[in-house]
């Protein structure tokens, strides 16, 4: 058997070092027909027909710096 990469004594060092943050109050997510409607509107209705490549579903509204 080969050895694992990195020792177990360093496991979890980043997570333990980050400060704890309280959970935010969020609206409950839509379910059922309302969720399907929201996804349909996001993909088809609100999408602007323009030039270039289609934006992916996981893209952010952050301008890219080239």
UniProtKB/Swiss-Prot annotation:
The GO biological-process annotations, alphabetized, read as: translation
Asked if the record carries the keyword Ribonucleoprotein, the reply is yes
Q: Which GO cellular component does the record give, naming just one?
A: small ribosomal subunit
| Entry keyword Ribonucleoprotein | yes
Q: Which InterPro entries match?
A: Ribosomal_eS30 (IPR006846)
What are the record keywords, sorted? Answer: Ribonucleoprotein, Ribosomal protein
Q: Name one GO molecular function term.
A: structural constituent of ribosome
Report residue spans for region: Disordered.
Answer: 1-35
Q: Name one Pfam family in it.
A: Ribosomal_S30
Source domain of life is Eukaryota
Q: Which PANTHER family match?
A: 40S RIBOSOMAL PROTEIN S30/UBIQUITIN-LIKE PROTEIN FUBI (PTHR12650), RIBOSOMAL PROTEIN S30, ISOFORM A (PTHR12650:SF15)
The Swiss-Prot or TrEMBL record describes its family as follows:
Belongs to the eukaryotic ribosomal protein eS30 family.
What name does this protein carry? Small ribosomal subunit protein eS30
The organism encoding this protein is: Dictyostelium discoideum
